[in-house]
Amino acid sequence: MLKAFDSKADVQAAPLPPAKAGNKKAQRNEPQFNPRTECYRILGVDLTSVPGFASPTVLVLLCELGPEFAEKFATAKHFGSWLGLCPDNRITGGKVYSVKTRDVKSRVAEALRLGAQSLCQAKNYFGDLYRRWKARLGSPKAITAMAHKLARVLWHLLEYKQPFNPEVFAKEEAKLQRKKLQRLHTMAESLNYRIIPIQ
């Protein structure tokens, strides 16, 4: 079935780098082909390089949405709203009545939620962000918020056909660390203390 899709990447001329080795054991019902390579050939972007996106998740996205789905949504916000992952703000007369997400039955949204949940122990920007949201919002809301972020990342990668660049998020993490350090210095000064870095 996947062979019927047109190729957007030449896997012979530009092969994928080897997948990271993990502790996952081989499953009995694993496909007899390389889903990572096939999805890369069809989509033109290696989505498995995004934290939280394993080959089964990408296969679900491809089967449910097709290879050209990014063109069907004007912006990443439209895509997130269609999935029911963003808040459905109901405001009347300046009063907020509800900010809950809409009840949307979508296999894609469920796949993104599973991908978000897999980041609970990830040692990267997405894992740190998920744990911060979980501490502040609780697990269900943190999973939905992270799934929404993954959906936006997914749309941008497929819309602009650009590979995932972790350095973009590394800059965000460095910016957050600077803000944390500034808050610590401010708190220490308010208590007549001074923070000295360890040499």
Question: Locations of the language-model features?
Answer:
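A detector of single, family-specific signature residues
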Residues: 1-199
